[in-house]
Amino acid sequence: MTSRRIAHAGLFGSAIAGLALMMGSGSQPKFGDPLKGLTPDLLTRFKVGKAQFKSPENPFSGLGPVFNDTACFKCHTQGAVGGGSDRLETRYGRVEGGVFNPLTQFDGTLVHAKGIGFFNGVDFVGEVVPPEANVVAHRRVNPLFGLGLVDAVPDQFLKDLAQFQQDFTPATAGKALVLTDVASGQQRVGRFGWKCQIGTVLTFAANAYQNEMGITTPFFPHENAPQGDTALLAANPAQTNPNDTNLTPMQFADFITFLAPPPQRPSSLKARLGEVIFLGIGCADCHLPTMRTGPNEVEALNEQTFFPFSDFLVHDMGSLNDGIGQSPATGQEMRTAPLWGARIRTSFLHDGRAKTIEDAILAHDGQGLAARNRFADLHEREKANLLEFINSL
């Protein structure tokens, strides 16, 4: 292991001892459980949010008129309510002269695959990719486990981490993207979404409510117009506009915020050996093992160490990108996917093309290419140990 990686592991990723202790504790919540240590009031908020997360919407309450599904949990089921899934959504746009155009005239960049049907003389059907698009990408559904911990990481930590990478691992250095958070109106460092395009759990929840189900709120009041045809919205049967107050997204946010991180398997000898290889070949340069929350009024989120195996920064992934620009991220940049909970997934990478962890590693390009090549050069036993480690997360 080079001195550079020793420094990296020592300052930002010293997870070997910590993981061994945590995985051996036997006291972790199960998939889908709330964080440990919640007060009765917070536990009630978690349960109310979970019930709302599972509750289906209908056209009269604001569903659609074009949408992707009727309830959050329809897409978030893997492992437990709040998990990911292999379902894919479609994004599109147009690139000319190296500049990404989101084709806003079609209400881009997300295809809403379903419509609410016939109302007031209009047959609302699912959308299609417009012929003007020359970039089409698919994205699988990310799990929500542990996102309250991610939300509670101070912005300054992510900025410092990006600077640390620039100083010590410049070839793989990520970017901390600063954006205006819709829910708070404040400048935040993005950390959610495939492009780190969202800064807080509340904005994430409200954005999904509008984008995936078409439910408008004061946070996101823009109605989904089928293929961008706003004239059709006059036939929308929704009874209020916005369709919802901000209450429901806040309830979703309660569920997500208090949802525990994925439990990790007890560490075998092979997994421990694999962890050393994981650190040694540079995986941890981006898939940072350990993070810590800042001061928080919720004790379960207050200065807690957790193990996401992501730096929550964006990196230039070369050919392993989706081409979709989501400001401030470019089409080339993708967020480092957290590896916690990897063992229950059945597809990997943003578009689900990889069906095994090994395939996902071998598909790395751009700033992930060097680590990919080091993995490819390992002996088969070393590869097996590394994969055993990732499958313990």
List the model feature ranges, each with a label.
Residues S3-R4, A17, T90-G93:
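Short, intrinsically disordered low-complexity segments
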Residues L21-L393:
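Periplasmic c-type cytochrome electron-transfer domains
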Residues T2-G13:
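Bacterial N-terminal signal peptides that target proteins for export
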Residues L11-M22:
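Hydrophobic alpha-helical segments of integral membrane proteins
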